């Protein structure tokens, strides 16, 4: 017990010392909340949402304020140095929650784009990386009628999209680990800015409403990289298949059609277990998916007794999941031969001898890989 306490004390001292190691006063630091990277005229354009007491109010009334500052240079380093010259402050990335990579940066080497952040002393390893359709600057500077959208709100939108199966999380530490694998592959969510019509109250003294377009963030695709380069995008269904086959679905929402009646499915709990085995020169991955789900809707419109209805809905759910998984593995393994399914990790752990013998011809391994999927579904009907 004394040893444990001693270790904790030393660890605490190290944390305190590391926190105090810099000599820069907080007033001299530019506290960055969001970063965006674009390529313009063969130059890097870096956009930052920076905490600023005298800046523009964020969307939550009474909340913090921020400025959006940009810098350009022939490297990310020099673009950030320009931001420091403009602000007169040292950029601090320790509070940064999101890194947007613009569409113009999509064809750049992903490892090179992230190098500055991986080498920075204070960058949070859980930093979320997101590709954008359009300019990253537009996302960093996105405004509502009440001001700039805060990093916390954007992070919350991403979390909800991940939960709903629309996005796959890509955090800095994980992406860096991914691109150190044989194929240098990784998958990163893609975000769009879309406009929706929304009824808003004209003023507080009137019940009259008017329709106005509101900008919202939406996730529906996933960028796939191979050899550190962007190669293709997965759609929403393929993204969900990717999440099933990498045990990233914990809960999700979807809908199915049962005899012409729409039924909402809430997956409250899910787990995927994967075990590879070798048959000749082929890899078969035994895949067991266990889910607890709830079905809701106008189920009385379906002319089935409870037992038949439960069986019918279960089969619909299973078929939907299998379709998503098969679609994903076909496009990734057969067409693009890109391992963002963590197959290398599975082989290295469970079939190490085979992995060592075959890694020099890894694309052939992927072509000869298949999944044997079984699904167990516990269902409640409301």
Task: Explain the meaning of each model-derived region.
Residues 3-9, 13, 17-382:
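Membrane-proximal alpha-helical signals and transmembrane carboxylates
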């Amino acid at each position: 017990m004394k040893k444990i306490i001693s270790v904790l004390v030393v660890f605490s001292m190290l944390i305190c010392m590391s926190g105090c190691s810099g000599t820069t006063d907080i007033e001299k630091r530019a506290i960055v909340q969001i970063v965006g990277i674009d390529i313009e005229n063969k130059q890097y354009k870096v956009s930052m949402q920076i905490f600023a007491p005298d800046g523009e109010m964020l969307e939550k009334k009474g909340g913090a304020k921020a400025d959006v500052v940009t810098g350009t240079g022939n490297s990310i380093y020099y673009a950030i140095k320009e931001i420091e010259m403009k602000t007169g402050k040292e950029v601090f990335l320790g509070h940064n929650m999101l890194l947007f990579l613009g569409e113009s940066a999509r064809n750049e080497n992903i490892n090179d784009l992230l190098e500055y952040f991986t080498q920075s002393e204070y960058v949070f390893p859980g930093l979320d990386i997101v590709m954008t359709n359009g300019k990253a600057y537009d996302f960093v500077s996105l405004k509502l009628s009440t001001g700039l959208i805060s990093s916390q709100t954007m992070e919350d939108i991403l979390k909800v999209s991940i939960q709903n199966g629309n996005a796959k999380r890509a955090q800095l530490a994980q992406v860096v680990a991914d691109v150190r694998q044989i194929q240098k592959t990784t998958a990163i969510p893609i975000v769009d800015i879309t406009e929706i019509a929304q009824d808003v109250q004209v003023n507080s003294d009137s019940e009259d409403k008017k329709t106005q377009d509101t900008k919202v963030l939406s996730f529906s695709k996933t960028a796939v990289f191979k050899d550190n380069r962007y190669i293709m995008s997965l759609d929403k269904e393929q993204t969900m298949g990717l999440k099933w086959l990498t045990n990233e679905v914990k809960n999700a929402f979807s809908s199915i059609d049962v005899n012409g009646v729409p039924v909402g499915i809430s997956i409250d709990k899910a787990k995927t277990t994967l075990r590879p085995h070798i048959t000749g020169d082929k890899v078969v991955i035994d895949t067991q998916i266990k889910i607890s789900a709830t079905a809701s809707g106008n189920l009385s419109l379906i002319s089935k007794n409870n037992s038949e209805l439960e069986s019918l809905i279960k089969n619909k759910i299973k078929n939907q999941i299998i379709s998503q998984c098969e679609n994903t593995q076909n496009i990734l393994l057969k067409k693009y031969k890109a391992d963002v399914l963590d197959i290398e990790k599975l082989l290295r752990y469970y079939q190490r001898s085979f992995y060592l013998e075959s890694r020099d011809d890894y694309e052939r391994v992927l072509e000869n890989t298949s999944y044997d999927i079984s699904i167990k579904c516990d269902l409640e009907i409301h």
